[in-house]
């Protein structure tokens, strides 16, 4: 069983946790359809950078 050699201070614990925060997904609005979508991804209508790339 793992046992720490000494107590981890509040400062050290906070430094370790400083990278644990969640970030919001980067979204953008398509110029053609006006639909909100994830960056660098095709919209649900099949548009990417204003160009139709997938026919439904």
From Swiss-Prot:
It holds the Pfam family Ribosomal_L32p. It comes from the Bacteria. Residues 7-16 have a biased composition (Basic residues). One of its GO terms (molecular function) is structural constituent of ribosome. Coiled coil: none annotated. Keywords: Ribonucleoprotein, Ribosomal protein. GO terms for biological process: translation. Residues 1-26 are annotated as: Disordered. GO terms for cellular component: large ribosomal subunit. PANTHER family: 50S RIBOSOMAL PROTEIN L32, LARGE RIBOSOMAL SUBUNIT PROTEIN BL32. Belongs to the bacterial ribosomal protein bL32 family. This is Large ribosomal subunit protein bL32.
